[in-house]
Amino acid sequence: MKYIPEPFKIKMVEPIAMTSREERANILARAHYNMFGLPAESVYIDLLTDSGTGAMSDAQWAAVMRGDEAYSGGRSYMHLMDVAGSIFGYSYIQPVHQGRAAEKVLMPLLVSRPGQLVVANTFFDTTRAHVGLAGGRPVDNVCSEGLDSAKVAPFKGNMDVAGLEKLIAEHGDDIAAIVMTVTNNSVGGQPVSLQNMRETYEVAHKHAIPVCLDAARYAENAYFIHEREEGCQDRSLRDIVAEMFRYGDMFVMSAKKDAIVNMGGLLGVREDGELAEKVKSNVISFEGYLTYGGLAGRDLEALAVGLEEGLDMDWQRYRVGQIQYLGDQLEEAGVPFQSPVGGHAVFIDAGRMLPHLAWKQYPGHALANQLYLDAGIRSCDIGPYLMDRDPVTQEEQQAPFEFTRLAVPRRVYTQSHMDVVAEAVTKIAREPEKVPGYRITWEPPVLRHFTSRLEPIR
């Protein structure tokens, strides 16, 4: 694919420096071979996450200066509510400091008794954790295409609707809620079609099961629908988003992705009734007062601007095109990845790239460590290392994939950076047997990948 020129110009820069391989080896050992333990200043190209790592626009920075820091009822809150309400169409919308805060507030209100199931097209890590912390059992139910990284299909993030109906038939009242993750991060940032969202919603409501949208990448999903779903090519992204949100009863959102802010999130409830009142009580307990939700007024202003900027068609065309450019280079080099690429990242299939490693040796994490050691590039595992142990048996859980995620921050890196990444991955792919596996030497009980300590298996 030909590289799409940036639809913006750069007004501010930050120097980055390359370390030596010897320095990186020492840094990696001091971090206990955990990507989250690396000092950011020792990273040359940081693809750990696209969450909160984007570059804000001049309009967002100007909005920061308008921040009203009133404790209650500030105009920045009112501005955000006007923008969010017009885009998403929900009666009650609550700012929170980030996506997992919305999950912490909402999940205990959905899971009413221990052992209830919450079914998703696929959970991401924090959502899965909060279902478990609320006493529920997270169940992944993605379509079969999403489980084959080599298969090219337009909407590999879709819910398996037939599988959902089977789960409902088997478990009935034991299903507390259904979560629709858009885009579907854990299977490669793959989009979900409007048709699938509609069908899932219809099945859920036939059985009186609430649907929650995990909408961190709402704009990228809308762009894929615009490009790939029949009858959507002449629709605006804003119009597509409005329909997407009609197929949910509530939503949680990390605004640090598509709204391109460094901190912030939203929680929405379609009908301002009993659930909304319970949400308000939890927000006051966990996040602060309702009209700031753990954020400064300046953050609310930047978020209001970013929600609109994320829906710009030229921006989304470039954004997805940049990921496609990286994917095309890796494909030419024979590197296996979840195909087609997602909206925010290339998910390298490390299980296929490093066949000499067993899944319990964490191939996705092993490749991430090697990429840092060789080139100073930080990425992360989306696989069994990311998944916590089974809460009942304490056994390791095998993930559908062993991915290494190259998540590209928004408006930060250029074509040359993508070329460096492609070259580094290609070099490793030529001699995959040199990459060692890893074992965990210490781990916490929940969300272990953030703070675990590991060592290479020599």
Where does each model-flagged region fall?
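Acidic carboxylate-rich catalytic motifs and surrounding loops in phosphoryl-/glycosyl-chemistry enzymes
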Residues: 254-255, 341, 382-385
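Short amphipathic alpha-helical segments
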Residues: 263, 344, 402-406
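Conserved glycine-rich beta-strand-loop-beta hairpin in the small C-terminal domain of fold type I
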Residues: 323-324, 338-350
